[in-house]
Amino acid sequence: MPCLHEIKALLALRGKPFHPDEKFKEKSPFWCLDGLSEEDVCSVMARSVCAKSAFELWGHGQTHSELRTSLLNYPSEDMSPFMHKDSTYRINVLTFNKTLLFAERIKRIDDLDYLPFEGTVSLKSPQHIFCMLEDYGTDPNNIPEHPNYIYFGRWIADGQRELIRSHSVKHRHFIGNTSMDAGLSFIMANHAKVKENDLVFDPFVGTGSLLVACSHFGAYVCGTDIDYNTIHGKGRSSRKNQKWRGPDENIRANLRQYGKEKMYLDVMVSDASKSLWRKAALFDAIITDPPYGIRESTRRTGSHKDTTKPPDGVYVESHVPVSQAYHLSDIFTDLLNFSAHHLVMGGRLVYWLPVYRPDYCEEMVPLNPCLQLISNCEQTLSSHTSRRLITMEKIKEPEELDSLAHLADPHFSPYQGHNAFRAKYFSGLNKRRGKEDNKSDFNGV
């Protein structure tokens, strides 16, 4: 679940542990966390796109009677700064999985008359907002008459879900067929713990969606891609009713669109299988979405010839490299080895791993001795395919044999199966289309 790991990563940025209460359930829409200051909460909510709102919990219970008892036991000295006569306030009633009538919400508010509110009600611009939260479960086909649980507290901050709308690829200047969704881009940046003045690199940069998200959090960004046309903003457009890309469609223009051009270092045409960087720990985070061979091809430069260095003084015909297939298992092996060498200690690698769901097991996740697996979250793409958001952290410097460790690892054989992902993807697609055709033929008869 990306939300859990996003919150953990953002708390880690402040050096805070994730301490849920004893009733914590990951799939619940309401989480109660202990040991956080209001400053900690505001810092997390200033970046999170998964969390909707955060509150200081004053009372809770399975019934309104239990809620009343809990609220009356809350220390009055903690309430009074927000309830004195010179303050203004508003009370909201929020529900999950059920809509209450206006009269029902008003009744809920009136029933809180046992609380010592002395201030003035202000619906438009209150100094303090209080909320009653009612949880009606997660099954829309089985909504209970009464809430499963009720919470009451003081609103502290909202999350940054507005970023998903403001940075939507629908309104972005430069896009491609596989431009990463804005929400997922920000989640990846948070998983990587990207912060101000970090240096972030994307080796499969494409149209730069991940660079846009990282630059929003104050990081300097750069990237490479093997596709010359994408890097230089040339060729056919991915937009409807537009044949060719415009002269100013490029990654730099995307950052300029959001006022982050100063965070742009550069992007280059480069083959990810052949590193062009000096041997040093350069990057605070590496965030990428490698091509899967479905909508974007997996390519690297190579040769069909067996080339050897000619003797001195012997002239040979010049050779132009050609494009070759780049197997998914090789992509991930190279990506992890590159990250082990070029991430700073404690830096994070965040990337997407496509999988064929019927064959998936945790052993298929590529490993590297220098990188510790932090999280593994699934995004379902279809009934038979999904992709896993993998987060890894550098825990040691690479040694000479680390780059070959995957060959001796028993996990290596299972994740070579990623090479067949494209064939399995289209096999499942063709089977589904065949069933639909048979069904339409049957209905036609």
Where on the chain are the PLM-derived regions?
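Class I S-adenosyl-L-methionine-dependent methyltransferase catalytic core
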Residues: M1-C42, S53, F96-N97, L123-C131, ...
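A short N-terminal interaction module
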Residues: P2, Y74-P140
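Residues that form generic nucleotide/phosphate-binding pockets
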Residues: L10, S70-Y74, L112, N254
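Conserved AdoMet
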Residues: D21-M83
